[in-house]
Amino acid sequence: IFNYAMRYYNLQDNPCRKAGAIGKSKGEPKDFWMQEEFNAFLETVSDKPETRMAFLLLYWTGMRIGELLALTYNDINLEEKTISINKSYQRLKGKDMITQPKTPKSIRVITMPDFLAEEFREYCSHLYGIMKKERLFRFTKSHMEHCMATGIERSGVKRIRLHDLRHSHASMLVDMGVAPLEIAERLGHEKVETT
């Protein structure tokens, strides 16, 4: 239409040409585990309560690894069954760093399923001497990646990345019929398209 208007009605420019092409969607298939695969993997870390709890939280809440590793007891409300995400952990140049979350939308409150809140309550009951502002999980992302690689090998489930546990959680929510906007908010995404 704009080309026609340029040719026959003296329109100076075609605004669509200035805008440029939208481009192709970069949405490539994401790797994820179904619940049966996750459960098979989880069996391989059942002898490590701290690691097991960390993987349970990643899978059932969809939080980022840095968000998990920054959690303190103050961030947990076992009565309300919620986790407040308000910071992130990184290890930079051999030093532990607590930083702001990835984006403003990353600051959020995540609900836990009843069984997870109960498991977390049991886990926390065995934490002696931990201060309310200390990190609940005192290991690093590389420790989690190592445990995951070992667990994958031992369980025989398909290989995915640590971050793909977020995709696993999102996929589970889609299967449950949760609206895309709710999933995006739960995962702390700025845009629904990211989800």
Please annotate each region the language model reported.
Residues 1-5, 19, 112:
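Non-catalytic DNA-binding core/recognition domains of DNA-processing enzymes
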Residues 1-6, 120-124, 173, 177:
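Hydrophobic recognition helices of helix-based DNA-binding modules
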Residues 3-15, 27, 49, 138-142, ...:
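N-terminal core-binding DNA-recognition domain of tyrosine site-specific recombinases/integrases
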Residues 7, 56, 60-67, 147-155, ...:
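C-terminal catalytic core of tyrosine-transesterase DNA break-rejoin enzymes
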Residues 11-71, 79, 115, 126, ...:
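Basic, Lys/Arg- and aromatic-enriched nucleic-acid-binding interface segment
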Residues 21, 37, 70-122:
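Conserved tyrosine-mediated DNA breakage-rejoining catalytic core shared by Y-recombinases
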Residues 29, 45-46, 97-107, 134-140, ...:
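Short, contiguous acidic/charged loop-to-helix segments that flank catalytic cores in large enzymes
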Residues 35-36, 88-91, 113-158:
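Active-site/catalytic core of tyrosine-dependent DNA strand-transfer enzymes
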